[in-house]
């Protein structure tokens, strides 16, 4: 959209500009901004291309109804919730979003028939309304780490605890690519305090609930609630190779480095008692407690104290670990408790679970749910993600040029970078591979029918 | 498979390459005699019911292996290996017909056949197991040579992570898409790399059982379709009655002939009722003594039981007469009741010697108002059942176990648990027949009586 076009849109936009100048800093989100966002910035055609997985009707092997069988849901202002929405194509999706201004858009599964027509089908027998494809998804939320972060709690997140999410991305992403062989993975900021992961390989989309559950359980290590002090129990004589690799490549270094610096988990009595409770031997607990209670008057920084105490703990356990099987991997258990990813299992297990769409705006923070580069996730800062009001201001000052396709280098608009990343590192490779698959399965089908003479 | 009347059986030409466990992939082209049709199925059914019993009792996998071994040897063995194999195959396919006919039957059959397969598989040696994997046509490659060398260290880590201190990396691993072994993935019992799980030979069971289960499940649906559209009607005078009877049959001894353990006389009857009768018969007996009457259902159930227990006809007549005449008078007794007692003993009418009812039949009966027959574990209210069990001498702890089984509708297991609590001994076979309860009880009591002083 050119500057002329923006200015000619009339009063609506100019009024908003005035509003912006008078806004309170907290006002990151409101319906008017959202309208403008949906009117100008939401990447409809990219989302449509993604979820069509190559079924764009250009190839004879395409299923033109594929996109129309995908369920979407809208959450409107006042928490009105509309499920089983489906759209024939990109423009009907765009129209629906522009007329409803949903505060949240969720993406569900691809069903056997158009969700709109589901009532015509029974629940048993051969003609059923049932999910047939759905991305393998994961949801990591910082509130699940509340028992191990001391800087924030609840919905807050800061630069001290966000690294927990970063480590989680690294561990899970490495496993998804190395262990499971998945190739088309999209990580998205959830808008406030976590991330979502969308695994889009055809193999992943066709997984059954049982298989999804198996992958989720494979990732599960933390089995905690208020009732047990030892929430990670690593049995056996060594770690499974997946856990060993995660420990060596990511968790150990993070625990001994960044975590100590940001959380100082040994520096006060409250904090270290929690860790001592994870050691299942009272004598060792008392021994360490004795050392630490007495060194309270040290002049070292919190971080340094923590590191010293960690070394003491490690040394003590190393010499005593043969005392009981539960002590064998106590050091690793502590590291895992503080750093290993905590995913929401229920989100991953069922095909029909709905998950928020990328590029939505979070109503509480106004931040856009932008993609995250898993290979550079250290650089991602949740507090620097563009907010709705920043985007609107940018439009009004004529700074954004939405023709992202032309003039790549000169486009510096806040959202364009994210959209470009989405396209180049996720969408394009995905569509290329989808087209190849459609092509080859079409060829196989043609080959088969040539050989048969069924009348 | 063709079912024929008694004729010489044509030797079967099926060239099944000798796996010890057939996979039942297709019905083999052989002829089956009509008698064998039923007999083979009954034998296999004994095995499946034994498996069902073992699972309901929570036997661990090793115990189940042994149980299956015993059951198979007892019911399905034949000195001729090819005869044994044929019986295996034929009986499976006959039971498919029997158990495809409703969702509940399908579910039971699928669970039992899968469990049977799982434990038979576990009992095979490694070579036989590999052959079976091959039979399934599973495109899994064994990992060998350089690839295996490269994985050895991590495979060892997996073994150690499962609690084995010195890793014995097995000789053969299979490279399997991870989707096919979800339970091994979920419990991190396998190494996974680039979408493939490396499954040890000893873990093959998981893989193979999943395939087996899926195949049988689909087959049952097809069989059901064929049954309802063609077979049921076509065979209504020949196979259909057999098929319909098989799913509800009782398979134990019929107790129509009393044995040495079970002769009782009128003098002993009260004492014996207290010490050795199962709850259903105790209740009926107490009611006869109390009310001096029983309605028809109760007279049949108790009367036939007493016959099986060894009460002679004359004593039976005396017993019933003694009670009933307190209410109805001697003449009416002779006119209305004596005849049917004699009938039960095969002395009247078509002179069939009726057999005492098995638990299955008693459980399925429908006592109405004023009736006292049926199975107390099923038909009594919880309060009444607890009271009755208390009178039998059960502690409140013993009672909980029994009530648990009742809640799960395992009425025979409840009775078995009662037996075990009353006699302080285990009853591995499980109670299937009131007369069995009586005989087992007598056995125990007689073995406890001290020898007569010389």
Predicted regions and their residues:
Chain A
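Charge-rich, low-complexity intrinsically disordered and helical linker regions
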Residues: 1-21, 290, 400-404, 450-455
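Residues forming anionic-ligand binding surfaces in small-molecule and nucleic-acid pockets
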Residues: 18, 126-157, 222, 227, ...
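SsDNA-processing nucleotidyl-transfer enzymes
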Residues: 24, 28-154, 345-347, 363, ...
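Catalytic micro-motifs at enzyme active sites that drive phosphoryl/nucleotidyl and oxygen chemistry
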Residues: 119-128, 173-177, 181-189
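Histidine-centered divalent-metal-coordination microenvironment in nucleic-acid enzymes
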Residues: 135-138, 177, 182-210, 356-358
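Long, well-ordered alpha-helical scaffolding segments within enzyme catalytic domains
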Residues: 156-182
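Modules that initiate DNA replication and primer synthesis
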Residues: 194, 201, 294-455
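Long, charge-rich alpha-helical interaction segments
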Residues: 219-334
